[in-house]
Curated annotation (Swiss-Prot):
<keyword id="KW-0372">Hormone</keyword>
<dbReference type="GO" id="GO:0005615">
    <property type="term" value="C:extracellular space"/>
</dbReference>
<feature type="signal peptide">
    <location>
        <begin position="1"/>
        <end position="25"/>
    </location>
</feature>
<keyword id="KW-1015">Disulfide bond</keyword>
<dbReference type="InterPro" id="IPR021117">
    <property type="entry name" value="Calcitonin-like"/>
</dbReference>
<feature type="modified residue" description="Phenylalanine amide">
    <location>
        <position position="106"/>
    </location>
</feature>
<keyword id="KW-0964">Secreted</keyword>
<feature type="propeptide" description="Removed in mature form by an endoprotease">
    <location>
        <begin position="107"/>
        <end position="115"/>
    </location>
</feature>
<keyword id="KW-0732">Signal</keyword>
<dbReference type="GO" id="GO:0051480">
    <property type="term" value="P:regulation of cytosolic calcium ion concentration"/>
</dbReference>
<dbReference type="InterPro" id="IPR021116">
    <property type="entry name" value="Calcitonin/adrenomedullin"/>
</dbReference>
<dbReference type="InterPro" id="IPR001693">
    <property type="entry name" value="Calcitonin_peptide-like"/>
</dbReference>
<keyword id="KW-0165">Cleavage on pair of basic residues</keyword>
<protein>
    <recommendedName>
        <fullName>Skin calcitonin gene-related peptide</fullName>
    </recommendedName>
</protein>
<feature type="disulfide bond">
    <location>
        <begin position="71"/>
        <end position="76"/>
    </location>
</feature>
<dbReference type="Pfam" id="PF00214">
    <property type="entry name" value="Calc_CGRP_IAPP"/>
</dbReference>
<dbReference type="GO" id="GO:0031716">
    <property type="term" value="F:calcitonin receptor binding"/>
</dbReference>
């Protein structure tokens, strides 16, 4: 999404620069119009584009649809287990099956005593 916005902004900037060079080669406006006015007009156009892009970002970030992040760390696994226990009725529930969660259950290498 950000890449699309950046590429569109660069395309608009490129078109703006090309338009500025072509207007100096064959002016479509009055020749008496001062050059700084054209530059300020370009600045106004860029400011309006940037405001529009930031408004779209704010609108997208404030929308109700939040994206759920996935993580595989032990903290997230513990949090998912706690959520499951709270939804299922906890340890006092008749459907509760205790699991073996010890230091040797998973994630550790077994050390060989043979050297």
């Amino acid at each position: 999404m950000v890449l699309l916005k950046i590429s569109s902004l660069l395309a608009v900037l490129g078109l703006l620069v090309c338009q500025m060079y072509s207007s100096q080669a064959a002016p479509a406006r009055r020749a008496l119009e001062p050059l700084p006015d054209r530059v300020t007009e370009a600045h106004r156009l860029l400011r309006a584009l940037i405001r529009e892009l930031t408004a779209e970002d704010m609108e997208a970030s404030s929308s109700g649809a939040a994206h759920k992040r996935s993580c595989d760390t032990s903290t997230c696994a513990t949090q998912r287990l706690a959520d499951f226990l709270s939804r299922s009725g906890g340890i006092g529930s008749p459907d509760f099956v205790p699991t073996d969660v010890s230091a040797n259950s998973f994630g550790r290498r077994r050390r060989s005593l043979h050297v």
